[in-house]
Amino acid sequence: MFQIDLNCDLGESFGAYKIGLDQDILEYVTSANIACGFHAGDPSVMRKTVALAAERGVKMGAHPGLPDLLGFGRRNMAISPEEAYDLVVYQIGALSGFLKAEGLHMQHVKPHGALYNMAAVDQKLSDAIAKAVYKVDPGLILFGLAESELVKAGERIGLQTANEVFADRTYQSDGTLTPRSQPDALIESDDAAVTQVIKMVKEGAVKSQQGHDVSLKADTVCIHGDGAHALTFAQKIRKQLKAAGIEVTAISEQRST
């Protein structure tokens, strides 16, 4: 039987500003990537998101981003590997505190936005991020773009890794995501998202914007919590995965059996 983890970026509200339908989406995902205050989120939002996920048995991970609230962490910054290491250690620590306060454990770490995309193609940056995760807790699972430099860095240092694919993003022929600056970067159709996910899970391939089948490994599927169709996508993808005979379960549970 095919198995897949379904994850979502959550806890991205800030102060009086509400982003996403976290409580509803948590009914359909198996892993939650929780913002740690740099690109989004704040201490109160983090605490509340941890509680919501725990109530539903959803596994949790840190979602560290660049220090860019205005740009939601989606703008590139010129940072050194040492700075990346510090940013990731700091943000893992922030979420870890809230989890420990409730007797809970962290499952994974997934960088956010520009940090994620930069690390996908930059070996030095990805090595620094993987080192940060490993030094904090070598038992954590590192999420990264499927078969990217970040996944390779995690494997080199001895971390468990998860090759991540996206339900709501289009791909280029080199396996990278289409930049958000391009008009065709986002998938808006429920049917298109479902078709892409099932193809990635069952066939290990995705149709690129250039019309080519690109091979990739799918361990976990991401739905962006701030997307306009996030809840609908989560509902339909979960339903259609089941119909296709694909078991949806948290990545850590897959690997403990």
Swiss-Prot record:
Keyword NAD on entry: no
EC number: 3.5.2.9
Coiled coil segments of this chain: none
Catalyses which reaction(s): 5-oxo-L-proline + ATP + 2 H2O = L-glutamate + ADP + phosphate + H(+)
UniProt keyword Nucleotide-binding, yes or no: yes
CDD domains recorded: LamB_YcsF_like
Alphabetic keyword roster: ATP-binding, Hydrolase, Nucleotide-binding
Pfam families: LamB_YcsF
SUPFAM superfamilies given in the database record: Glycoside hydrolase/deacetylase
GO MF term list: 5-oxoprolinase (ATP-hydrolyzing) activity; ATP binding
InterPro entries associated with the record: Glyco_hydro/deAcase_b/a-brl, LamB/YcsF/PxpA-like
Phenotype seen when the gene is deleted: Deletion mutant grows less well than wild type on minimal medium with ammonium as nitrogen source and cannot grow on 5-oxoproline. Mutant lacks 5-oxoprolinase activity and accumulates 5-oxo-L-proline.
Top enzyme category: hydrolase
Biological processes, Gene Ontology terms: carbohydrate metabolic process
Purpose of the protein: Catalyzes the cleavage of 5-oxoproline to form L-glutamate coupled to the hydrolysis of ATP to ADP and inorganic phosphate.
Family named by the database record: Belongs to the LamB/PxpA family.
Subunit structure: Forms a complex composed of PxpA, PxpB and PxpC.
UniProt xrefs under PANTHER family: 5-OXOPROLINASE SUBUNIT A, UNCHARACTERIZED PROTEIN YBGL-RELATED
NCBIfam families registered for this protein in UniProt: PRK05406.1-3 (NF003814), PRK05406.1-5 (NF003816)
This protein's name: 5-oxoprolinase subunit A
Originating species: Bacillus subtilis (strain 168)
Lineage: Bacteria, Bacillati, Bacillota, Bacilli, Bacillales
